[in-house]
Every structure is written in C-alpha cells, then in structure tokens.
From Swiss-Prot:
GO terms for molecular function: cyanate hydratase activity; DNA binding. The active site is at R100, E103, S126. The gene is cyn1. Its EC number is 4.2.1.104. This is Cyanate hydratase. It comes from Aspergillus oryzae (strain ATCC 42149 / RIB 40).
Amino acid sequence: MSLATLDTSQHPNLPSASATLFKAKAAKKFSFEQIAQHIGRNEVATAAIFYGQAKASPEDITNLASLLGIPQEVLEDQLNGFPDRGKSVEMPPKEPLIYRLYEIVQNYGYAYKAVLNEKFGDGIMSAISFSTKVEKETDADGNNWAVITLRGKWLPFSRF
C-alpha cells in the first residue's frame, strides 16, 4: 500500500508540526486510517491535523506522540495554538486531485446552493459543525468509485 507523504519544499505554508508528523508517519509506515483508529478520530480529521487545518485535542497529542514516537513536549509545542486554516492551498489549486474538488464546486456550487436553499431555506451549511468521510466503492464491473460525504449543520440567516 502506498502512503501519503509530505514534501515540505512543495508546501511552504504548512506549520512545523506537519513536517514532524509526516516524517514520523513515514518512518512508522502508518496510513491515516490506522492513525485515526488509534486516536479515535475520523481519517479525514486526522489528516487535517497533519496539514494544520484542524485543532488537535490534548488527547490527540498524547495519542499521536505515543503512536508515532514523537516526544510529547515537541507535539504540544507545535500543536498548541489554533490552526491558521485556508493557507495550505493556493487558489486555484494546481494539484490535480485538489483541483478536481475545486472544479466540483465551480461546476456544481450554484446547483448545490439552489437545491439546499429549496430544501432548507435561506442559509448556509456549516463547515464548523461539520463532518466528512471518504469511502471506496467497487461496482459490478470492478471500477473503483470515490464517495465523499459532507455533513454540515444548516445555519439559517438571521433576519435583523
């Protein structure tokens, strides 16, 4: 199985914890799924911690340090602040898979908005009260399909 790694020269905007975490992940040969199971988080949420896009709880830090063999004090120091979200990807993205996700929003964003507004009214889907997961499906012909679920709390706009 191939594992996600990080070339820090290609990602200069990531926090120092990213390099620490990815180096230990590669050394231990763990997938995000394996790490997520150990720390009790979703694999996408776990990967988001590695990329500096999600806040690690004290328990996450303890469990990551133990699993990956990183001194806990180092991780506490590197993961102690609040994430500076949204800086890790240039816009529009150049990485092909990330660009396809961007392209989905470009092509279907207004369609999603229209359908969501019809179903829920005027508002937005939260990316804070939010969860996501990635699943793999194989059809009868043996083709693999990526299934990405986005689940966000509906937040109606306030009238004032």
